[in-house]
Amino acid sequence: MSGYTPDEKLRLQQLRELRRRWLKDQELSPREPLLPPRRVWPMEQFWNKFLQDGAPWKNVIYKTYRHSIFAVTHVLIPVWIIHYYLKYHVTAKPYTVVERKPRIFPGDTILXTGEVIPLIEGFPXQPS
């Protein structure tokens, strides 16, 4: 016996028809796809209206605005954060280690002012 039985032929014909209908259903109508309205932020809405006429000076203003936003968000704020971290968390803090001040003896000179400490009258073991 060669070939398909009548039941197999009918089944294959129905599968082909089903495939054709499925492929036809996949074609989009001119109204599809229906996209939801896009939400626009207030600043974006402002710039869209501002740039509508396409004047060159408006493009320059917009580009300056965009570059300044980039500079603030990608340069200034990270630099401030790094500066804060280095200033308050990494550098050695003053007055954390308490040391005695060096002793001052009669006849010594104070470096900051150049003042000479006077000799004490009647103090034993002073060079004369």
Curated annotation (Swiss-Prot):
Coiled-coil ranges per UniProt: none
Membrane-spanning parts: 64-86
Residues modified to N6-acetyllysine: K24
Modification N-acetylserine, positions: S2
Gene Ontology terms: cellular component: mitochondrial inner membrane; respiratory chain complex I
Main localization of the protein described in the UniProt heading: mitochondrion
Top-level taxon in the UniProt lineage: Eukaryota
GO BP, one annotated term: mitochondrial ATP synthesis coupled electron transport
Places the protein is found: Mitochondrion inner membrane
Bilayer topology term: Single-pass membrane protein
Function: Accessory subunit of the mitochondrial membrane respiratory chain NADH dehydrogenase (Complex I), that is believed not to be involved in catalysis. Complex I functions in the transfer of electrons from NADH to the respiratory chain. The immediate electron acceptor for the enzyme is believed to be ubiquinone.
Similarity comment: family membership: Belongs to the complex I NDUFB6 subunit family.
Protein name: NADH dehydrogenase [ubiquinone] 1 beta subcomplex subunit 6
Organism listed in the record: Sus scrofa
